Amino acid sequence: ALAEPAAVALHAVLLAEQNLKKPLSESKILIQGAGAIGLLCGLVLNKEKNSTNIIMSDPNKKRLDECAKYLKADFVSPDNKSIKENNFDLILESVGLEVTRHQAIKSIAPGGTILHIGLTQPSGSFDFKKLTIQEVTLVGTYCYTNKDFEQTLKILNEKKLGDLGWIEYRDLKKGSEAFNEIHNGTCVAPKIILIP
């Protein structure tokens, strides 16, 4: 239940590394979304790539507080003033809403890279003028390769992502309640695993 989102996160970070014009450890990074994939992207950046110049944004303050226990980053609401225009070398958009895509393109620095991971809203408008004029790289990322998955299993087996106390386990009978909390934005845990 954790290997799949961790492999998605690792794959996204590896694609970012391939497309950035400077090392990840020297890049100013914004992670949009504090769910499992956003947090796992941050953990891969922290633990595997020595990146700590990270801001994570999410409207769910309680979830950000939970992520702050495990991730070296600054944690802010999406409307926080620290998310400035033309400010980030790398943005990992793990939400997939039109509003987060707009914020990503607005906040990316000239020559920066946006990794689009989230799939909540499959369509919407996008500022292609800025993308073109400022030579922003936009990379769509979906799933992972077999090699990424094998590397993820090794990372998880060796406990390289640290304490996984941010995962919440619930009885399968409470699945509907969990999905409602996720949908309503009140779920604290970045990842819930339902146990039959």
Show which residues each predicted segment covers:
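C-terminal hydrophobic helical "lid"/dimerization subdomain
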Residues: H102, N146, E150-P196
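A generic alpha-to-beta junction signature in SAM-dependent methyltransferases
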Residues: P23, V95, S107-A109
